Amino acid sequence: MAGNKGRGRAAYTFNIEAVGFSRGEKLPDVVLKPPPLFPDTDYKPVPLKTGEDEDYMLALKQELRETVKRLPYFIEPPEEKQDDIERYSKRYMKVYKEEWVPDWRRLPREMMPRKKCKKGDPKSKPSKAAAKATSLINSADVLKTIEELEKRGEGERSDEENEEKEGSKEKDKDDEEDGEEDAEQEDYDEEEQEEENDYINSYFDNGDDFGVDSDDNMDEATY
């Protein structure tokens, strides 16, 4: 029951005895020492020769190596100077590169670089007559386009003038209507002012004149 349902210890999937250990045996101790640097050689190197000749050859070899490093044997492409951006660090930089100009008299002609000229195909070159015809066609097209543009400009100008005339007429009509409305408003305002100013006239009546005409026909009292 313990092996199939996930309980108990897991069983080993490989044979330990095949590795060289038996069950219950201790593993060997871990070695913490570094390995030897170089294995023992059967043939030992010959000791270097010392003396004035060897020292002279060594100094000569070193001097030759340094001179070869300084010579411009490696031709580099010229750097393009960018004058747009001036950097502060470039002001004090010293250029140690030397321009190498070889003496071509001592070198073969095959080593001399040559500029390659691009040769065009004869088929691709147009003839003079075809070039003239294309130039005439282009000039005629240019004249046509200029005439069309002039016509368009004249049409636009006439349209603008008509629009300006119509706009001026509409403005005149609006001004006349505004003048009539202003006149009507002034008349109306005058009538209102007259009605409002009626209180200036005196309408007071004390009643003395009441019945003056009727006294002539009335009979006086007799005593």
Swiss-Prot record:
Keywords: Antiviral defense, Cytoplasm, Immunity, Innate immunity, Nucleus, Phosphoprotein, Transcription. GO terms for biological process: cell population proliferation; defense response to virus; epithelial cell proliferation; innate immune response; positive regulation of innate immune response; positive regulation of interferon-beta production; transcription by RNA polymerase III. The modification Phosphoserine is found at residue 158. It is found in: Nucleus; Cytoplasm. Residues 111-223 are annotated as: Disordered. Disulfide bonds: none annotated. The modification Phosphothreonine is found at residue 134. Residues 173-198, 206-223 have a biased composition (Acidic residues). Expressed at low levels in the liver. GO terms for cellular component: cytoplasm; nucleus; RNA polymerase III complex. It comes from the Eukaryota. It holds the Pfam family RNA_pol_3_Rpc31. Residues 111-124, 144-156 have a biased composition (Basic and acidic residues). GO terms for molecular function: chromatin binding. Component of the RNA polymerase III complex consisting of 17 subunits: a ten-subunit horseshoe-shaped catalytic core composed of POLR3A/RPC1, POLR3B/RPC2, POLR1C/RPAC1, POLR1D/RPAC2, POLR3K/RPC10, POLR2E/RPABC1, POLR2F/RPABC2, POLR2H/RPABC3, POLR2K/RPABC4 and POLR2L/RPABC5; a mobile stalk composed of two subunits POLR3H/RPC8 and CRCP/RPC9, protruding from the core and functioning primarily in transcription initiation; and additional subunits homologous to general transcription factors of the RNA polymerase II machinery, POLR3C/RPC3-POLR3F/RPC6-POLR3G/RPC7 heterotrimer required for transcription initiation and POLR3D/RPC4-POLR3E/RPC5 heterodimer involved in both transcription initiation and termination. DNA-dependent RNA polymerase catalyzes the transcription of DNA into RNA using the four ribonucleoside triphosphates as substrates. Specific peripheric component of RNA polymerase III (Pol III) which synthesizes small non-coding RNAs including 5S rRNA, snRNAs, tRNAs and miRNAs from at least 500 distinct genomic loci. Acts as a long tether that bridges POLR3C/RPC3-POLR3F/RPC6-POLR3G/RPC7 heterotrimer and the mobile stalk of Pol III, coordinating the dynamics of Pol III stalk and clamp modules during the transition from apo to elongation state. Belongs to the eukaryotic RPC7 RNA polymerase subunit family. This is DNA-directed RNA polymerase III subunit RPC7.
